[in-house]
Amino acid sequence: MADEAGFLMSPSVKKTWAPRGDTPVVRCRTRRHKKVSVPGAVALRPATGELALLCDFHPDSYVRGEQAAAFLHRVLAEYPAGPVDLVWDNLAAHRSPIVKEVVAAHPRLTLHYLPPYAPDLNAAEWVWCLAKHHRMANHAIDDLDGLQAEAKKHLDDIAADHDLLRSCFKGAGLATAL
């Protein structure tokens, strides 16, 4: 299950607790809308039920065909033997000519597309929600390098917690064992 997320310098503001009259304020030094784009996948080995989180980071960029193709190469390198079935949404970059070239060059790679407007079926969306709206909520970051480091730290923490990854997979209504 693959998808992309944008981690923004302006924080995701969530409700929090504070004593009456002491309203918490998230100070943000920038009005720029810089971000780090992260294509990623929650990968499952069906034979073993082993889960992994694969992520690439593209500071101050959008995920276009070139980045999607580079991510496919990353997935193929991580899983060098056997078939690779990748499920993702209908982003235009996923259907770009360069992505089609990668698929044509690697017959063991098969792409499957989710129905439009179905993020709840994608385990990667659950990972993005955890990272962006829970772990990084109410936290302003001043520069792009710091934003990338913070996103990487939280995604690495999620990747290291196999029970949490499994819950993201199950949250999308998917089984982790055959």
Indicate residue ranges for each PLM-predicted region:
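Short, aromatic/basic amphipathic alpha-helical patches
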Residues: 96-106
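Extended, low-complexity cationic-aromatic segments
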Residues: 1-73, 172, 176-177
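Generic structural signal for small/hydrophobic residues in well-ordered secondary structure
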Residues: 3, 40-42, 72, 89, ...
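RNase H-like polynucleotidyl transferase catalytic core
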Residues: 24-31, 107-123, 140
